[in-house]
Every structure is written in C-alpha cells, then in structure tokens.
C-alpha cells in the first residue's frame, strides 16, 4: 500500500500508525505529513487518510466538517478507485451515527456510482444504512447480520441502532456485547452508551435484573 512505501509522503505517520494504531498521536503525525504537500493528488490522499482516522477515533463532527470543506473544493476527485469509495462509506457511517441522515443520503445518491462501485463489506454497510435511513429496517438488519463476522468496522453499532428501530431490545442487548471496545473513542463511545441506555430501558424487568447481574 502507498501509505507504507519508503518514498511515501506519509511514511512518518505510517510508522506511528504501525506502533500505536488509530490514536490521536497518529492523527497529529498525519496532519504534519500533510502540511508540506503540494500535489493535489497527495493532498487528497492525505486528507482521506485523516478523515478515516478521525472517524475511527470517534471524532465524527471534525471528520464530517473536514470532508465537507474538501468535498466543496472537489479535492477528492483526485483519489484512486479504491480510496474514494472507502472514504464515502466511512463518511456515510459518520453521518448516520450523528443522525444527519440528509447528509448521508446526499452522498449516497449524488455519488451513487462511486458508492456502489465495489462489492466490499463497507459498500454493503452503506447499502444497509441507506435502507435503514429510508425506514426499511428489516432489509437493513438482513444485510448487516451477514457482516457481523466480517472485518467491516462498526457493524455492531449500525445493527443495534437499526434493531432498536424495530423495538427488538433483547436482540439489541445481545448484539451490543462488544460495545466496551468503543471506550475512549469520543462520539462512538457516546453513541454506544446512548444505545445501551435505550436497550436497558426497553428490557423486561427480568432481563434488567439479568443485565445488572452481568454488569452490562
């Protein structure tokens, strides 16, 4: 991958990523790598990496603002056929979590040929979110359920948020088992906590007792 080539303008931040993962330290290192860039293609690539990193870190509002700024400048048309769809999938997810459905749907519809360009799991996640945002919750759950054992990020948040639209509190409780992984991840942690509260409020008295005993 270009991110890890020795000649890559992102080699310094790539080293931080390899050592620390998608942390604030990586985000700051990436910002420093982007600053001196002159070529639009390199800037587009760097900003796409940055937006994705911000989303993974749960800094969703910041990521969306950055996307909106550079999208208005048509910067991302410089991205290659793999990076551009992945960026759009992640931004759609960020808007979905922030309940900015109109923004997510605008990307899905206006850039539909790019969003649906591949058959990746992230594309399937975007398709499911589109179904959910249009009230077709059963369709969304069907698609997301098939992604639960995949490497696609954030599927548990997406499916729990969707299952709760169907008032399936017990199922949502089961699907939220790994929400602890979002601890320290800003807006993602806040969303996980909000969903857990909604789940608990909807459980039967017996299920609530069971959940408390399990420390959920």
Predicted regions, residues:
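Alpha-helical repeat scaffolds
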Residues: 26-33, 60-73, 101-113, 137-148, ...
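Flexible helix-coil transition and linker loops at the boundaries of alpha-helical arrays
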Residues: 33-43, 72-82, 112-120
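"A position-specific structural signal for the A-helix of alpha-solenoid helical repeats
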Residues: 12, 49, 90, 126, ...
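Alpha-helical segment of the N-proximal tetratricopeptide repeat
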Residues: 8-32, 36, 49-56
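Eukaryotic alpha-helical solenoid repeat scaffolds
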Residues: 21, 153-216
């Amino acid at each position: 991958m270009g991110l890890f080539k020795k000649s890559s303008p992102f080699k310094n931040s790539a080293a931080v990523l390899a050592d620390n993962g998608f942390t604030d330290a990586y985000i700051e290192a990436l910002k420093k790598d982007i600053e001196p860039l002159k070529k639009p293609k390199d800037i587009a690539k760097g900003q796409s990496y940055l937006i994705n990193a911000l989303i993974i870190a749960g800094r969703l509002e910041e990521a969306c603002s950055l996307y909106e700024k550079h999208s208005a400048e048509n910067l991302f048309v410089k991205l290659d056929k793999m990076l551009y769809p992945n960026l759009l999938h992640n931004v759609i997810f960020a808007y979905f979590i922030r309940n900015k459905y109109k923004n997510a749907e605008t990307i899905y519809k206006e850039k539909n040929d790019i969003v649906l360009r591949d058959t990746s799991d992230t594309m399937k996640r975007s398709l499911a979110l589109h179904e959910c945002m249009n009230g077709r919750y059963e369709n969304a759950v069907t698609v997301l359920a098939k992604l639960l054992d995949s490497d696609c990020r954030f599927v548990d948040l997406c499916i729990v948020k969707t299952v709760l639209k169907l008032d399936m509190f017990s199922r949502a409780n089961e699907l939220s088992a790994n929400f602890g992984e979002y601890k320290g991840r800003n807006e993602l942690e806040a969303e996980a906590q909000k969903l857990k509260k909604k789940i608990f409020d909807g459980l039967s008295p017996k299920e609530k007792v069971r959940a408390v005993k399990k420390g959920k």
